[in-house]
């Protein structure tokens, strides 16, 4: 019953600090500072190209800039923290000067801690806190909004014949467990976004459902 109440409160959330919800969609512009992301891998890793693209995303109407330095598309391999941060820092340091709502896409607690020093507004962990158990401690300490993302398996395995009893109900059950988990770790706020993870451990039929 408590989890159901939490889910209703999260779904009715009207705003986060620096971001208001209304009847209009909120657009997130994705900036992949990687050589191997599926949509724009390698396009923005060179000097100044990342910030130039960020400005274009803002001009095109994006409310959130989601910046990441590690590809998590199907078949991608994990990278070391120092490599990920080296990709992110040149652009992140400039993006915050644009005074926009910035989301940091990372699975690693160390990258989160470093990003928080640049006053990021949101943490987007596609692993649902399963990759690095220290991430939940970072979230509790900072009280920052975050995304609970659903992914079946990991980036290397998630598209290898994913199966569900009922994809909608299974994902709902997953979010129930995750909310129970974050509550058990002492996170009381409802600054939470639930992402069903379209394309992450799901075939076309799963995605359409």
Please give the residue ranges for each predicted region.
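Glycine-rich, proline-tolerant flexible connector loops at the mouths of alpha/beta enzymes
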Residues: 38-39, 63-91, 198-204
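Conserved, mostly hydrophobic/aromatic
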Residues: 31, 57, 61, 105, ...
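Conserved beta-strand positions in the central sheet of alpha/beta enzyme cores
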Residues: 2-5, 63-66, 103, 124-125, ...
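Alpha-helix-loop-beta-strand connector modules within alpha/beta enzyme cores
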Residues: 77-104, 110-114, 141-151
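Short beta-strand/loop segments at the ligand-binding rim of alpha/beta enzyme cores
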Residues: 24-27, 96-105, 121-122, 189
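N-terminal amphipathic alpha-helix/helix-capping segment at the start of soluble metabolic enzymes
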Residues: 1-35, 180, 187-188
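Conserved anion-binding
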Residues: 27, 33-39, 71-75, 112, ...
């Amino acid at each position: 019953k408590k989890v159901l109440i939490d889910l209703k409160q999260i779904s009715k959330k009207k705003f986060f600090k620096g971001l208001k919800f209304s009847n209009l969609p909120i657009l997130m512009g994705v900036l992949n500072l990687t050589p191997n992301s599926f949509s724009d891998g390698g396009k923005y890793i060179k000097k100044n190209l990342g910030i130039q693209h960020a400005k274009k995303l803002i001009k095109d109407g994006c409310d959130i800039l989601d910046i990441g330095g590690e590809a998590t598309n199907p078949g991608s391999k994990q990278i070391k923290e120092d490599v990920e941060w080296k990709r992110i820092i040149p652009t992140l340091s400039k993006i915050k000067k644009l005074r926009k709502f910035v989301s940091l896409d990372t699975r690693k607690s160390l990258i989160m801690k470093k990003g928080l020093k640049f006053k990021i507004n949101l943490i987007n962990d596609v692993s649902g806190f399963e990759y690095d158990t220290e991430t939940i401690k970072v979230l509790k300490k900072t009280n920052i909004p975050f995304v609970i993302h659903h992914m079946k398996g990991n980036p290397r395995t998630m598209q290898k014949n994913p199966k569900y009893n009922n994809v909608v109900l299974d994902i709902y059950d997953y979010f129930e467990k995750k909310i129970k988990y974050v509550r058990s770790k002492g996170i009381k706020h409802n600054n939470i976004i639930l992402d069903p993870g379209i394309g992450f451990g799901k075939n076309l039929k799963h995605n359409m459902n």
